[in-house]
């Protein structure tokens, strides 16, 4: 090349894209809002090691039709950067001059993960991560391994808020730390000699929005106005990157405002308080083994308002993963909670549970096992009418003109607070929630609500917005929810 000639720039990262691509962590999530150049950053990142002959990469979307835009963009960038590279449309794979390969794949159903069994990829990228379930993502972590010497092994993902995986993605990447701060998880590995070794794995979230993509705004000045004109939930998610409000969210009424924990106005989450002795106590239960089991205790005041005052959630700490303990052990833990907690000790407690625990078609029922000595835990079958139960949630979450809803939750009930606002609608049964989610707390609460049905409120009130002339609250929502 003549010294006066200049190399053609195929693609130049925006500052936030560059920040994402420079991260050293084994896992990184890029996104939040729309228009930040997420897909381009993922596509270009996959090229980092194509000079290594044995390098193998995989870029995933939920379904193959959704891959079309990514493939089109790869045709534009990859072919210009590597003119000799070839794309096989049948196998959905790019083959580079060195022999390196980048595949495009999908995982429409969780069972499709077995298509990648026995495979190894140095780089795995997920586009629109919230469209995937935790079991799908975690399985692919086992496929993320070196294909030969000298490769860097890591995973990258992009996404907007919303979708079936919203809850686990938020819990894994958004909630634990501020954006750009590494989230370090310590795990214990049992070695062949019987000793335990502590190991660490890090991940990070890098936020992006249309404001980080001046090239897009310059090319399409109207795009910003398009995002701003969306319905409120979609606008908050796609324009400002809010993880509290998103399209497809079932319980848009939900509010968690620490400023009102004490006065109990305009918030569903409140500070714990002593329960009067004359208030009835109810216990809801949803059985789980490989999935979490859920127990919630509720107090009922004179006005019929329900308070979730305590919970026992049988999960491992990983999304939607149960403790795998039998009904008798679950009964033991429930009874211990009621004997040791001052809010529950000595109280008459009414139990209502999923009717499925009374099934005797395969032997002794779960309900019978729990009722045996020494725990003597008794249940009555709950009303399992799904849509009616969902509507009871909506009725009770609405705020009255004085700012009080008919269902409130103690701030100590962390799993309720985590899971309920993340529930999304089922795409095929659009009036009901998607049951593939972590819906166990929702179910046990629904059984209790159906024991205390209320009529639809005559008028619904919305919580007042705080005085925020500089929109500082809105900006804070973008960075940390």
Segments predicted by a language model, with ranges:
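Pre-P-loop entry segment of helicase/translocase ATPase cores
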Residues: 1-26
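Walker A/P-loop NTP-binding motif
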Residues: 39-53
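Conserved RecA-like ASCE P-loop NTPase motor core of nucleic-acid helicases/translocases
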Residues: 55-67
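Inter-Walker segment of RecA-like/P-loop motor cores
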Residues: 66-122
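Walker B catalytic acidic pair
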Residues: 127-128
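ASCE P-loop NTPase helicase motor core
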Residues: 131-213
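ATPase catalytic-site recognition across NTP-hydrolyzing enzymes
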Residues: 212-287
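Mg2+-dependent endonuclease catalytic cores in nucleic-acid-processing enzymes, primarily RNase H-like
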Residues: 296, 304-437, 453-460, 464-465, ...
């Amino acid at each position: 090349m003549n010294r006066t000639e200049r190399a053609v720039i195929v693609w130049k990262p925006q500052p936030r894209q560059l920040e994402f691509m420079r991260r050293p962590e084994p896992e990184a999530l890029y996104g939040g809002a729309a228009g930040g150049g997420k897909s381009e950053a993922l596509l270009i990142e996959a090229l980092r090691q194509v000079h290594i002959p044995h390098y193998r990469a995989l870029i995933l979307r939920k379904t193959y039709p959704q891959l079309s835009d990514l493939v089109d963009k790869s045709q534009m960038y990859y072919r210009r950067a590597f003119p000799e590279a070839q794309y096989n449309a049948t196998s959905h794979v790019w083959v580079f001059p060195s022999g390196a390969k980048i595949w495009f794949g999908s995982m429409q159903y969780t069972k499709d993960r077995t298509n990648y069994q026995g495979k190894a990829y140095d780089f795995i990228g997920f586009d629109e991560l919230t469209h995937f379930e935790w079991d799908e993502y975690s399985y692919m972590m086992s496929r993320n391994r070196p294909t030969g010497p000298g490769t860097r092994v890591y995973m990258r993902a992009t996404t907007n808020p919303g979708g079936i995986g919203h809850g686990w993605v938020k819990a894994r990447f958004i909630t634990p730390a501020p954006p750009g701060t590494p989230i370090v998880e310590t795990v214990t590995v049992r070695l062949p000699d019987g000793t335990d070794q502590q190991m660490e794995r890090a991940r990070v979230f890098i936020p992006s929005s249309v404001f980080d993509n001046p090239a897009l705004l310059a090319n399409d000045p109207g795009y910003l106005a398009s995002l701003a004109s969306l319905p409120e939930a979609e606008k908050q998610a796609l324009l400002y990157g809010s993880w509290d409000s998103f399209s497809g969210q079932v319980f848009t009424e939900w509010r968690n405002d620490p400023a009102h924990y004490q006065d109990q106005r305009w918030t569903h989450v409140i500070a714990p308080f002593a329960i009067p002795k004359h208030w009835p106590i109810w216990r809801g239960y949803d059985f789980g083994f490989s999935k979490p089991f859920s127990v919630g205790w509720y107090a009922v005041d004179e006005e019929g308002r329900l308070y979730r005052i305590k919970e026992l959630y049988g999960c491992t700490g990983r999304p939607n993963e149960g403790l795998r303990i039998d009904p008798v052990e679950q009964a033991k833990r429930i009874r211990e909670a009621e004997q040791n907690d001052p809010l529950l000790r000595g109280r008459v407690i009414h139990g209502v549970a999923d009717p499925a625990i009374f099934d005797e078609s395969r032997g002794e029922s779960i309900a019978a096992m729990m009722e045996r000595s020494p725990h003597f835990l008794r249940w009555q079958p709950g009303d399992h009418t799904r849509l009616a139960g969902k509507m009871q949630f909506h009725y009770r979450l609405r705020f009255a003109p004085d700012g009080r809803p008919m269902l409130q939750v103690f701030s100590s009930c962390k799993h309720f607070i985590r899971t309920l606002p993340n529930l999304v609608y089922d795409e095929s049964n659009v009036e009901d929630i998607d049951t593939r989610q972590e819906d166990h707390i929702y179910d046990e609460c629904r059984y209790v609500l159906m024991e205390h049905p209320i009529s639809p409120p005559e008028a619904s009130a919305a919580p007042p917005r705080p005085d925020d002339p500089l929109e500082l609250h809105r900006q804070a929502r973008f960075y940390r929810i």
